[in-house]
């Protein structure tokens, strides 16, 4: 019974995928480059718009009890927000499109020989996504820690840390080099190593975009992933929680968490912001 249902699901998805490609075309470069950039852009701004509306209207009222770092950046400073949005848009267009083009021609084009029209099995998709998560954690953790050292922090990563109590829409507010090294490479290179199918890549980019918005939203909803308070804690303390999922932070002793009252552990409180 389960096998029949799975086969029916795969057949349905394959049919819809073929129809989609019949409409938009099945040229790999166009799909990997512009399809990926457009997917990220749509998910980012739709979800960010909802969360930004919550930030400005403070409605629905029940969400306020899930606010992390209450009283900070509340209300949102629009004078800081508007320039930040320009940076976000720059990163998502003038940085992202050439980067996606380069990644396709130097990574995906040679690493991936899969038939773009033939969807992978459910088992293969789940396995590839799980492996990508492990690789993403490794690449992001060590890359992120590197960005906290000396000149790399001062001239590149510090820009992102201007928001010690961030909101969702500034998730991509960062130096262009950081957008390449931290926001894109951990995901894109993981997919290249795994040699994932385009659809698996889109699923992974969609999940990653949702996660980065949730991680910077400033709200720990009941349905939020554990990474939400985890990454918010990083913005509040600077020197803890460098990873995506916390696995390597626990290994290297850089893991931190808010106490039951929502306060930063005393020994983790920064004396001053890094310069």
Region annotations inferred by a language model:
Residues 1-26, 30-34, 53-63, 67-76, ...:
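Cytosolic/stromal cytosol-facing helical appendages immediately following the last transmembrane segment
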Residues 2-38, 94-125:
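Long, highly hydrophobic alpha-helical transmembrane signal-anchor segments
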Residues 34-38, 85, 126, 130, ...:
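Hydrophobic alpha-helical transmembrane segments
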Residues 38-48, 89-104, 131, 182-189:
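Hydrophobic alpha-helical transmembrane segments of multi-pass integral membrane proteins
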Residues 41, 55-109:
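N-terminal helical submodule of small eukaryotic multi-pass membrane proteins
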Residues 76-97, 117-137, 171-172:
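Alpha-helical membrane-spanning segments of integral membrane proteins, especially the hydrophobic core
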Residues 96-109, 133-154:
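Transmembrane alpha-helix/helix-exit interface in multi-pass inner-membrane proteins
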Residues 120-141, 145, 201-214:
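Membrane-embedded alpha-helical segments that form the functional core of polytopic membrane enzymes
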């Amino acid at each position: 019974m389960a096998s029949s249902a799975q086969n029916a699901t795969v057949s349905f998805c394959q049919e819809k995928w073929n129809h989609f490609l019949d409409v938009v075309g099945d040229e790999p470069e166009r799909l990997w480059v512009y399809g990926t950039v457009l997917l990220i852009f749509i998910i980012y701004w739709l979800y960010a718009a909802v969360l930004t509306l919550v930030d400005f209207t403070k409605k629905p009222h029940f969400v306020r009890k899930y606010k992390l770092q209450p009283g900070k950046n509340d209300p949102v400073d629009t004078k800081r927000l508007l320039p930040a949005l320009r940076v976000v848009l720059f990163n998502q267009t003038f940085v992202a499109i050439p980067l996606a083009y380069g990644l396709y021609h130097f990574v995906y084009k040679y690493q991936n020989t899969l038939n773009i029209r033939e969807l992978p099995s459910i088992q293969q998709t789940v396995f590839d996504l799980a492996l990508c998560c492990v690789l993403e954690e490794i690449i992001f953790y060590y890359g992120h820690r590197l960005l906290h050292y000396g000149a790399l922090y001062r001239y590149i990563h510090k820009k992102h840390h201007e928001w010690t109590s961030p909101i969702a829409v500034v998730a991509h507010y960062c130096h262009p080099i950081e957008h390449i090294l931290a926001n894109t490479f951990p995901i894109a290179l993981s997919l290249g190593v795994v040699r994932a199918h385009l659809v698996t890549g889109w699923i992974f980019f969609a999940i990653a975009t949702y996660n980065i918005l949730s991680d910077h939203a400033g709200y720990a909803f009941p349905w939020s992933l554990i990474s939400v308070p985890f990454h918010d804690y990083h913005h509040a303390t600077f020197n803890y929680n460098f990873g995506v999922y916390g696995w390597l932070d626990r290994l290297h002793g850089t893991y931190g968490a808010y106490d039951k009252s929502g306060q930063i552990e005393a020994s983790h409180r920064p004396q001053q912001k890094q310069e």
